[in-house]
Regions:
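Alpha-helical segment proximal to the catalytic Tyr-Lys
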Residues: 125, 174-176
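Conserved mid-core segment of classical short-chain dehydrogenase/reductases
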Residues: 88-106, 125, 129-135, 155-158, ...
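Catalytic Tyr-X3-Lys loop
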Residues: 87, 98-118, 142, 166
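Short, small/polar-rich loop/turn modules that mediate ligand/substrate recognition or access, typified
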Residues: 178, 183, 238-240
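Canonical Rossmann dinucleotide-binding motif of NAD(H)/NADP(H)-dependent dehydrogenases/reductases
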Residues: 2-33
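Active-site helix of classical SDR
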Residues: 120, 162, 170
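Residue(s) in the substrate-gating loop at a strand-loop-helix junction
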Residues: 146
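C-terminal substrate-recognition "lid" of short-chain dehydrogenase/reductases
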Residues: 2, 220-244, 249
């Protein structure tokens, strides 16, 4: 899918990996739309890169439809959806204070997995209405999972389950949406230098970086964005999950 001139929506696009994706798409000539719960950060970034910012929740159907409808009305229709919105609340199944509250588990699943699916299904409906491009292509969806989907650590039951669900969505979604000319791929990032990690002490950051075989450093969000670019532009990549992690395999703790 050619990025230049395409209308794109990035969820969680106001910071971290989503911000890097939004900047990449804008730099390559896309009409960028950002959907994020942080109004101030979203509007600030939108002003910098010439994007449109929407304040909303990916699990809210009305919020999602509003942003997608605006994005679908630009150019020749919605062509790109990149799902980066997510949360990472930790909690043990059975901790010192008893079992993990079910509401805590449900919240992580709802935001990460249900939110991703909600955006994907609604975006697909709009992409299917767009005119065909060369080869019958109509759109591409890139979802964000995590290496926790494969090596969830202690305290990550909810997070790992949510990201594992996103990994499992890739192939059936790609197969179902193929008849509409819509591709679906997923990136499973390792440890990246996001605002959350940047808030940690330097020695903690270095300790995390030393766990990565090569290169022995934290991932740069721009590298995540470049992987998303590849998945958007390479028309033959479909139904795939790409680990982007410097060959790290997370330990139990």
């Amino acid at each position: 899918m050619k990025i230049s001139g395409a209308s794109a929506l990035v969820t969680g696009g106001a910071s971290g990996l989503g911000e890097a994706v939004a900047r990449m798409l804008a730099a390559r000539g896309a009409f960028v739309n950002i959907l994020d719960r942080n109004r101030e950060a979203g509007e600030k970034l939108a002003g910098e890169i010439g994007a449109v910012s929407f304040t909303g929740d990916v699990t809210n159907e009305d919020d999602a439809k509003f942003a997608l409808d605006i994005a679908a009305g630009v150019g020749d229709g919605l062509r790109i959806l990149v799902n980066c919105a997510g949360i990472g609340t930790a909690g043990r199944i059975l901790g010192r204070e008893g079992p993990l509250p079910l509401a805590d588990f449900e919240r992580v699943i709802r935001v990460n997995l249900v939110g991703t699916f909600n955006m994907m299904r609604l975006a697909a409906a709009r992409m299917a209405d767009a005119p065909e491009r060369e080869g019958g292509a109509r759109g591409v969806i890139v979802n964000t999972a995590s290496v926790a989907a494969f090596e969830g650590q202690v305290g990550q039951a909810a997070y790992a389950a949510s990201k594992g669900g996103i990994v499992s969505l890739a192939l059936p979604a790609a197969r179902e949406l193929a008849r509409f000319g819509i591709r679906v791929n997923t990136v499973a990032p390792g440890i990246f230098l996001t605002p959350l990690l940047q808030s940690l002490p330097e020695d903690v950051q270095q300790s995390l970086a030393q766990q990565i075989p090569y290169p022995p450093r934290l991932g740069d969000p721009a590298e995540f964005a470049d992987t998303v670019r590849y998945l958007i532009e390479n028309e033959y990549v479909n139904g795939e999950v790409i680990r982007l992690d410097g060959a790290i395999r997370m330990q139990a703790r």
